[in-house]
């Protein structure tokens, strides 16, 4: 095996690895797939007397290393599907019971007849090349599904020639083949009969994707996961008029370009964008995704839950996958808010949404809106709508009473009111001693001692040298806490609705 600067696939002890070389180095560095245990791999190789070199946590092999022998496509095909050894007709257990096999010979005889094969799976058969000089239309006329994953292909053109000779072929899987020369010929071949293509983890870039869309114009399902694709103005799938399912998961720099085609996902039903550096749902061209029913945007850095409002326009969206823990909220709370914001959802993270769960989610959302109004002192509908554009839809669907917005008041225009059905209320405060008057907002659950401390702070007077009279103009009553027990009363425990608080100096004797 010989490679120049770059990467290529090889097989060592029946384990698929990637080899890299830089410059004129006499060694290849061995890179293992994520699912391979490095320690176990090294032990197995040494046990089989494979001369691996381990240095500083990296694995190397010399150029003359005894790699596993490669096969051609036909060699692998005949090895698996034309195996001629007889099957046992029965098996006898230790107990003496004998079990006869029925029908297996018939199955094997059909496998031996390659012309009747409809599904071919040659996963990890160390296939390096395809003999393009044969007429595969006569050898494999009925093949519908072809899986050549985890082999040693480094050029795509022989596979393309094979597909062009299989008229019944509909599904092609080429996962984990590292194509160092994806477009290897100037010859243009169209494969109009292929409807599903999977090229996950094949080292493809944006130019390769554009070539795929032109070569396979009838694709309905396309998997491009774990490649090196970057969406740009030159990247588009609009040539694939029949495309329904597209997966670009684990393309870590997918959204790193400054701009990308707005019609890149036009007409797609199922879209997977997990782990693609998507930081804001607003980056999705939702106006071109009106047919979308499934969307996976999990494992992306989406932290603003309000950005999900962009998905409300997708009326056909039924299933959403998203990482709830990224919203800096408890997972159960984040789940309720996501459900409430997207009314079309029937499934979230592969779990069905029940009618009761949707009701709970929307009612919880309304409580969050009320809290938002109070905490931010929102004054009117327009101000709230700028923050939460769709709050009124949920309000009307549940026929909820109108929100009581924050009302600003000054000393001049303040009028007395009653503390009722409100969390906070403006109370007029006057200090007889200093001749000052002001308006404070008090919480109905505050203790009188806390209120006295707050008022004393504003008027710069000691708490224990003044008398505080809580009065009501409507009932003509007053209440002056004199004992510790009264001091611990809360505002709603007073025998009347408080509208005034007067502060007197104790030495005046006026209570």
Curated annotation (Swiss-Prot):
GO biological process: microtubule cytoskeleton organization; post-chaperonin tubulin folding pathway; tubulin complex assembly
Keyword Cytoplasm part of the UniProt annotation: yes
LRR repeats mapped onto the chain: 116-137, 142-163, 168-190, 191-217, 218-241, 242-264, 267-288, 291-312
Position of the signal peptide: none
Domain LRRCT residue range list: 325-364
GO cellular component, one term: nucleus
Presence of the UniProt keyword Repeat in the record: yes
Subcellular location: Cytoplasm, Cytoskeleton
InterPro entries the record matches: Leu-rich_rpt (IPR001611), LRR_dom_sf (IPR032675)
Chief location category: cytoplasm
Superkingdom in the source lineage: Eukaryota
Function per UniProt: Required for microtubule and spindle assembly. Involved in the proper folding of alpha-tubulin.
Subunit structure: Interacts with alp1 and alp11.
UniProt-recorded name of the protein: Cell polarity protein alp21
């Amino acid at each position: 095996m010989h490679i120049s600067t770059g990467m290529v696939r090889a097989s060592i002890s029946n384990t698929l690895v990637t080899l890299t070389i830089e410059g004129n180095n006499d060694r290849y560095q061995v890179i293992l797939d994520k699912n391979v245990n490095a320690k176990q791999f090294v032990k197995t190789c040494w046990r089989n007397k494979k001369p691996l070199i381990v240095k500083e946590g990296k694995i190397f092999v010399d150029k003359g290393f005894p790699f596993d022998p490669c096969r051609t496509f036909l060699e692998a095909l005949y090895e698996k599907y034309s195996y001629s050894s007889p099957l046992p007709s029965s098996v006898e257990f230790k107990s003496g019971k004998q079990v006869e096999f029925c029908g297996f010979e018939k199955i094997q005889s059909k496998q031996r007849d390659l012309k009747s094969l409809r599904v071919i799976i040659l996963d990890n058969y160390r296939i390096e090349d395809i003999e393009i000089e044969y007429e595969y239309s006569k050898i494999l006329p009925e093949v519908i599904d072809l899986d050549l994953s985890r082999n040693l292909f480094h050029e795509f053109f022989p596979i393309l020639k094979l597909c062009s000779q299989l008229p019944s072929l509909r599904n092609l899987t080429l996962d984990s083949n590292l194509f160092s020369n994806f477009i290897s010929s100037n010859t243009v071949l169209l494969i109009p009969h292929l409807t599903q293509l999977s090229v996950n983890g094949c080292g493809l870039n944006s130019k390769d994707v554009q070539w795929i869309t032109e070569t396979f114009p009838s694709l309905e399902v396309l998997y491009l996961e774990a490649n090196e694709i970057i969406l740009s103005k030159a990247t588009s799938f609009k040539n694939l008029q029949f495309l329904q399912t597209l997966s670009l998961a684990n393309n870590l720099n997918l959204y790193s370009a400054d701009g990308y085609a707005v019609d890149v996902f036009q007409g797609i039903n199922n879209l997977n964008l997990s782990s693609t550096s998507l930081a804001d749902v607003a980056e999705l061209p939702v106006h071109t995704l009106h047919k979308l029913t499934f969307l996976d945007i999990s494992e992306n850095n989406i932290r603003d839950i309000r950005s999900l409002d962009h998905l409300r326009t997708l009326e056909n969206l039924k299933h959403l996958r998203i990482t709830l823990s990224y919203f800096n909220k408890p997972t159960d709370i984040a789940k309720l808010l996501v459900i409430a914001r997207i009314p079309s959802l029937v499934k979230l993270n592969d779990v069905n949404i029940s009618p009761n769960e949707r009701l709970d989610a929307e009612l919880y959302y309304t409580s969050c809106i009320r809290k938002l109004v109070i905490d931010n002192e929102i004054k009117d509908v327009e101000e709230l709508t700028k923050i939460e554009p769709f709050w009124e839809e949920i309000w009307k669907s549940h026929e909820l009473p109108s929100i009581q917005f924050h009302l600003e008041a000054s000393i001049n225009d303040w009028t007395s009111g009653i503390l009722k059905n409100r969390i906070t209320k403006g109370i007029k405060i006057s200090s007889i001693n200093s001749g000052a008057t002001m308006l404070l907002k008090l919480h109905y659950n505050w203790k009188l001692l806390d209120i006295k401390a707050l008022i004393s702070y504003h008027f710069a007077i000691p708490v224990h040298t003044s008398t505080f009279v809580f009065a009501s103009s409507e009932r003509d009553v007053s209440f002056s806490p004199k004992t510790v027990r009264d001091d611990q009363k809360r505002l709603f425990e007073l025998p009347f609705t408080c509208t005034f608080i007067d502060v007197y100096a104790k030495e005046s004797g006026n209570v």
